[in-house]
Amino acid sequence: MQEKPIAVTPGEPAGIGTEITIKAWKNRSCPPFFLIDDVERVYSRAKDADLEIPIEVIKTPSQTLDCFHNALPILPHKFPVHCKAGRPVDDNAQSVTKAIKIAVDYAKEGVVSALVTNPIQKEILKRAKFEYPGHTEFLAALCGEKTKPVMLLASDQLLVVPVTIHEPLSNVPNILTEQLLIQTILVAERALKNDFSINRPRLCVSGLNPHAGENGTIGSEEEAIIKPAIESLKMRGLRIFGPVAADSMFSENARLEYDIAICMYHDQALIPIKTLDFWNSVNVTIGLPIVRTSPDHGTALNLAGTGEADANSMIAAIKLADKIYRNRLANGDPE
């Protein structure tokens, strides 16, 4: 098998992305990767964080393999404004999204094994007319996927998928449908088999309402939407159960009964995994023809330039991207 590097995008240039990427390289345990970034800015961020880092400027991703063990490979990508750590500027928004597109193109062309995206500052991009709620939706559009993208959060202790992602909580009951639930769960089951090599995955589905609706006495979504979706999927042979009350499905004993938790909305899924293992959790976009992971935290502008940013989630994201790529090859699934 020909080795391929991983492409890492810079994310918000005023955030901690560059610092945690440098720390990931210095950790010396990651598979080969290169950073798409402004070389002068990388040196500046390294100085801010009091990090010494040898850098090798590359012209093509393949050159990563020649220099990675001796220097951090940088594929030059200019930002129009040199912003200070912790102080984002709107004029850099287009360069942030362009770096993501470059990485996706490399992945689609097969010259990189995966992409790992550093956190973006959503309000900055929104002011620049960025039309997507976040990375997940943007990546699906770049890959030409017409189905709703699926976010999976992964740690050693838990795998979890929110059916609805970046939506106001007040909108969730109107967005949630039997079709959406079935579609999301089928994508999740396929990812468990092909990306995580779990041959017969067990799926636990949460309710939407307190106590999973108590048979329709606290809301109607469980009876009208969630239970019919589960029964339909059982008919297809999936090992799936629920709806389970969300307040009882994440205990240590409860987690032994399933391989993945399917939750109805963002915080229902992310609160438990971040509580269990905040700095080692990874965001994965599943259902795409390419492999994409990301550290499961934001830009942390308050930590940018201090040298105090924790790189464990970035390290975990790089390692998991490599693992998923290799699992797909072993399972004969290019996605």
What feature does the model see in each segment?
Residues 153-183:
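Ligand-binding beta-strand-loop-alpha-helix segment within the catalytic cores
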Residues 138, 151, 160-162, 290-292:
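Conserved hydrophobic/aromatic beta-strand scaffold that supports enzyme active sites
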Residues 127-150:
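Glycine/threonine-rich beta-strand-loop-alpha-helix active-site module
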Residues 77-80, 148-150, 154-160:
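Flexible glycine-/small-residue-enriched beta->alpha junction loops
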Residues 147-151, 326-329:
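Residue-level signal for secondary-structure boundary elements
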Residues 1-135, 175, 179-264, 268-283, ...:
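Contiguous, glycine/small-aliphatic-enriched amphipathic segments in soluble metabolic enzymes
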